[in-house]
Amino acid sequence: MVGFMGDELFKEFKEHSVAEFFRKNKHMLGYSGKIRSLTTIIHELVTNSLDACEEAGILPDIKVEIEKLGADHYKVAVEDNGPGIPLEFIPKVFGKMLAGSKMHRFIQSRGQQGIGAAGVLLFSQITTGKPLKIITSTGDGNIYEVEVKMNVEKNEGEIVSKKVRKGKWRGTRVEGEFKEVSYNRGEFGPFEYLRRISLATPHAKIVLKDPYGEVVFDRVVNELPKKPEEMKPHPYGLTTDELLYIARKTKSKKVSSMLVSELSRVTTKRIKELINYMLRDLILKKFKDSVFWNMVVSCYLNIDIESYLNKFKDYITDDEIETVRMLIKNLPESLDELKRYALKYITMEYLFNKLSEEEINKLKNHFKKIPENFMEWAEKNYLSATVVDELNKKVKNIVKNPEEFIAEIKNKGLISDEELKKFEDEVKSILNKNPKELTWDEAEMIVNCLQSMEFMAPPTTGLRPIGAENIEKSLKELLQPDFVKAITRNPKTYKGGIPFAVEVAIAYGGNAGRQGDEGRRMEIMRFANHVPLLYDASACGLTKAVKSINWKRYGLRGEDAPITVFVNLISTFIPYTSAGKQAVACSENENEEIYNEIRHALMICGRELEKYLSRIRREAEEEKKRKYVMKYARIFAEALANILNKPVDEIEEKVVKLLE
């Protein structure tokens, strides 16, 4: 009966394509809400156009057309002057999920997954049933007009119609109809998105034609930014799974050459160093649960305990000192008992660093006796977890330097030359094997050893900032502020080896800030790799970093000020909070390197703003005083004229000049 039920259940078992998954979960692609869905469409098509133009070395000219066809029904067209798309790639670009030119590259880019354009087609198809119309040419004299639909079950694009005509034009135009969308020029729609992306791409010209008219976001820089270089993964950001993935894809014939060619900061010299680390870990792995491991620990433990005996001699008895020294002489047989004393001294050291002299004296008698169960004693003092951590740290320090560790255990006769040679051969065999034969345990050991070594931070050639000067030009063009200050911080790393950089700017006065019921208030513009983040502001670490600043210190009334704060995070990997990619995960406790960089940059800009506001207030105060004095200049001149017996007008003229 049970077997029959199992057969029945699995009759409904089916495989599903990634396109089918997103058809049922379109909100994960940003298609949730009428305005947000239309903004997502514009975002995907515009960023694709920008990326194509920049990769081809072309200054982007982008046209966006939004036409209302009916209630919640719009036609959208995005046209660029980019390199065009070869005919054979059109079905893959627009009709296949997870197909693209970015996901496999370790480089800063606006998008990576290869979902965006295909997601636009999928949304058009499930809301109107209509294909996307693609007009494109690579400049070879042939202009293709193609209609593409998606076979959702197969996750493949299909050309349903094709026309070819001759003409001199190069670029791509995408047209589509969409329902369940809405448009306005509010702060969370396509207009605001284009307004902000024009700030982050000052070298692009974007023309928007919508139901309200035409708006031109002109370029303010006539030079393309330098292309970011593709980077290699850094050892500190490497995982076992990633190393095995690299091993499957590499063209290298040996693991050692793969590490040099595929990873950043790994050289042939560092491979020799890696051999010692792997040798250390292999020895420890083989003997960690044996008497050998206890003997290894004892080599170092006796030195530590001697230092503790001298340090805490006022808190332990002479008999205890003698007992400990006898135990050391009788190693390794007495190691288990000696460990109990070692744990006591580690705990004492921890307490001495934490407690006051008075509290230590109260515990003095407690120190002078060894309880039956020392861990129980520590637990009563709420220190068991900390004590174990301290002990683990000491064990790690014991084997921190692999060369010293190997030399020490060899000198003490804990390992023979034959045994050591056997381990060395095993390490060399791992590094000399074909990468495709690498096992999980071997890859895990390599990753752990690499992350125990010291490496320079990864190169930052894969990052491409907008540049402080360009940000200031864009903000001046868009907001006409009274004051603007931008800064691009030097690149740093987070999570051990992922490079990132932060750019921030403050614009004050003019059209800065957002209009509220009681005047202009602070406006926060968030960007990730130059792409505007319009939604989920309260959940975003960039917002939290801005709000953590005490703006009153810089002469503002908190957030009730006409100020626009610009924050752009650039990285080869942006730590988004979710698949929607609208909020960045960073705070005081998570990816704090990013959070702190934003704060530091904002404080630098804030100090410049404070100087500006102080000068303005000082000038205003001086002007007020001058006007006050000028008010009485005539009276003063009349009195002085009587004394000097000179014309009043002549005296007044000189007084005014003096005041000016």
UniProtKB/Swiss-Prot annotation:
- A Pfam family annotated for this chain is Topo-VIb_trans
One GO BP on record is: DNA topological change
Key word Chaperone present in the record? no
Q: Which InterPro entries match?
A: HATPase_C_sf, Ribosomal_Su5_D2-typ_SF, Ribsml_uS5_D2-typ_fold_subgr, TopoVI_B, TopoVI_B_transducer
Q: Which positions bind ATP?
A: 48, 80, 101-102, 111-118, 581
NCBIfam families in UniProt: PRK04184.1, PRK14867.1, top6b
What is the protein named? Type 2 DNA topoisomerase 6 subunit B
Ranked from the top, the taxonomy reads:
Archaea, Methanobacteriati, Methanobacteriota, Methanomada group, Methanococci
Question: What gene name is listed for this protein?
Answer: top6B
